[in-house]
């Protein structure tokens, strides 16, 4: 029997995560944890409780995924990830069957790779990251923990996206450049960054 997975955070990103989890077909979604009870029955899945209920939910469930989005700040995702981890939840890597991840790439716990994303050879993606729909992580690129690479963004070879950063839709980083921590790269922009030493 497939293990049950709880989703932490309702809303638009959660809907996209549900679709990927259903398509991957490795977990059964038990329900959603959110501070807003009105999200009950999101795409047919029940509301399980508030963030404060996670300790009790751990008695029944082993797996959790952070499904709240990230644009301006990673703070909420980081807090929830660390809290779930401290309670002993396992935070799996979720990969859409429509994505391509090289067998030579590495992905950290709690990261989700959405439909039609591509992660190439020897790329490294940290924990609790969103690799969103149609994004490209090229060879030898590094995406540190708690980053969101948004829809259609391109991280070229050898680039480093520092922890907590957001790269907007259709933004492009040049090869072998480095962002700052918690950087915000605007949608559609070309990021020239600083050359790696």
Identify the residue ranges that each predicted region occupies.
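Short alpha-helical
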Residues: 12-13, 72-75, 106
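Structural signal for interior beta-strand "rungs" in well-ordered beta-sheet cores
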Residues: 93-197
């Amino acid at each position: 029997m497939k293990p049950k997975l709880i989703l932490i955070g309702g809303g638009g990103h959660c809907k996209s995560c549900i679709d990927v989890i259903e398509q991957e077909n490795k977990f059964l979604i038990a329900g959603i944890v959110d501070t807003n009870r009105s999200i009950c029955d999101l795409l047919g899945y029940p509301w399980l409780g508030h963030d404060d209920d996670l300790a009790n939910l751990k008695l029944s469930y082993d797996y959790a995924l952070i499904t709240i989005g990230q644009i301006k700040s990673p703070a909420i995702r980081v807090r929830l990830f660390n809290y779930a981890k401290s309670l002993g939840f396992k935070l799996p890597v979720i990969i859409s069957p429509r994505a391509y991840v090289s067998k030579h790439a590495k992905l950290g716990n709690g990261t989700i790779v959405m439909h039609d994303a591509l992660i190439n050879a020897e790329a490294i993606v940290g924990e609790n990251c969103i690799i969103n729909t149609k994004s490209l992580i090229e060879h030898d690129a590094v995406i540190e923990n708690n980053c969101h690479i948004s829809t259609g963004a391109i991280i070229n070879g050898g680039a480093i996206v520092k922890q907590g950063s957001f790269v907007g839709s259709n933004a492009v980083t040049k090869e072998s450049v480095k962002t700052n921590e918690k950087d915000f790269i605007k949608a559609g922009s070309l990021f020239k960054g600083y050359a790696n030493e």
